[in-house]
C-alpha cells in the first residue's frame, strides 16, 4: 500500500499559529523532510515530536526526491516542512511533490501560516488578482530590469526581501516605478515587532531609510498594480445625443461640462466631439 506525502505549513513567527492537525500529522508520519533539520528540530522539540528527520534543501532536492518517492511507494508516510510557512513558496519541495504526483502518490496539504497570504490580507491593496515573484535578484542592475518588466502590471505584485537588501531594493524600485506608486512593506509578521506600512513609495523609502529598526527582519513587499487608462476616443450614441442637445443652447465649454456630469464620459473626448459637431454645422 502506497504511503502519503503531507505538505505541512509551520509558523512564520508565532508558535501559537501551529495547528493541532499539523502537530498530530508530524507526530504520526514515518519521516519528516525538512529544509534545515537543525531549525525544524527546535520546533519539533517544543511539541515533543521525535520523529526521524531528513534534510531536503535547494542543493539536494533533485537528487533526494527519487529516494523519498520510493519510500512513499513502499508504504511510508512522509511530511514535508520548510523552516517557516508553507513549503514550495520560495522554499524547497517542488521536485518531491512533482515526482510524487507523477508516480501516483497521494499528496495532501496541511495548511497554515503563509507570509504571502498573511501580508496580502492586511495590505489594503487589491487582492482579486496578484502575482507572487518570490525573492528578488541580488544585483541592482538585475532588479531594475526585473522592475521595468513589471512596471505596467495591473495586478498587485508581491516579493520577499531580506534585511541586508531591503533598502537597496526599495531605492531601485523608486527609480523605476516613480515616487507616487503605492506600496506596502510588511515586516516580521506575527512576531513581536510586526510592522505594516502602507504609503507612496517615496514615503515608505524615507521611513525605512531613517529607521534602522525598519531595516531588520524578514520582509514582504507588495506593489500596487499600474492604473491602465483605457484609450477611449469615441462617444456613444446616447452621449452624442446629450451633447448635441446641450450645444443648441450652450457654449462648447458649458455644454461639455454639463455632458460630463450627465453621461460620465471623459471631458477630453466630449470636447473633441463638440468641436467636430460645431465644425460640421
Map each language-model feature to its residues.
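A contiguous loop/helix-start segment that scaffolds small-molecule binding in enzyme catalytic cores
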Residues: 2, 156, 163-281
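Class I SAM-dependent methyltransferase SAM-binding "motif I" and its flanking Rossmann-like core
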Residues: 95-153
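Ordered, amphipathic secondary-structure segments that act as subunit-interaction surfaces
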Residues: 74-84, 89-92, 161
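Glycine-rich, flexible N-terminal cofactor/catalytic loop recognition
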Residues: 1-58
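General beta-strand structural signal in soluble alpha/beta enzymes
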Residues: 34, 107-112, 159, 185
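Short active-site oxyanion
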Residues: 26-32, 104-108, 156-157
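Conserved helicase motor
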Residues: 56-62, 136-139
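Loop/turn-to-beta-strand initiation segments
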Residues: 3-5, 75-79, 155-156
Amino acid at each position: 500500500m502506497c504511503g502519503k506525502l503531507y505538505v505541512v505549513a509551520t509558523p512564520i513567527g508565532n508558535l501559537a499559529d501551529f495547528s493541532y492537525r499539523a502537530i498530530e500529522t508530524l507526530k504520526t508520519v514515518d519521516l519528516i523532510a525538512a529544509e534545515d533539520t537543525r531549525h525544524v528540530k527546535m520546533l519539533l522539540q517544543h511539541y515533543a515530536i521525535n520523529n526521524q528527520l531528513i534534510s531536503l534543501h535547494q542543493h539536494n532536492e533533485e537528487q533526494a526526491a527519487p529516494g523519498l518517492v520510493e519510500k512513499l511507494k513502499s508504504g511510508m508516510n512522509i511530511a514535508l516542512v520548510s523552516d517557516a510557512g508553507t513549503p514550495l513558496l520560495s522554499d524547497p519541495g517542488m521536485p518531491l511533490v512533482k515526482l510524487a504526483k507523477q508516480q501516483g502518490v497521494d499528496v495532501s496539504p496541511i495548511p497554515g501560516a503563509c507570509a504571502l497570504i498573511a501580508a496580502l490580507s492586511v495590505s489594503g491593496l487589491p487582492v482579486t488578482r496578484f502575482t507572487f515573484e518570490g525573492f528578488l535578484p541580488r544585483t541592482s542592475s538585475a532588479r531594475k530590469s526585473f522592475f521595468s518588466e513589471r512596471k505596467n502590471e495591473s495586478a498587485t505584485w508581491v516579493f520577499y526581501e531580506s534585511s541586508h537588501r531591503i533598502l537597496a531594493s526599495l531605492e531601485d524600485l523608486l527609480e523605476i516605478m516613480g515616487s507616487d506608486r503605492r506600496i506596502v512593506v510588511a515586516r516580521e509578521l506575527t512576531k513581536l515587532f510586526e510592522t505594516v506600512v502602507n504609503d507612496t513609495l517615496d514615503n515608505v523609502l524615507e521611513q525605512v531609510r531613517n529607521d534602522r529598526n525598519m531595516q531588520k527582519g524578514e520582509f514582504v513587499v507588495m506593489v500596487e498594480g499600474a492604473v491602465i487608462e483605457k484609450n477611449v476616443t469615441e462617444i456613444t450614441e446616447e452621449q452624442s445625443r446629450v451633447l448635441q442637445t446641450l450645444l443648441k443652447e450652450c457654449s462648447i465649454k458649458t455644454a461639455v461640462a454639463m455632458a460630463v456630469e450627465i453621461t460620465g464620459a471623459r471631458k477630453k473626448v466630449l470636447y473633441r466631439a463638440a468641436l467636430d459637431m460645431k465644425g460640421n454645422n
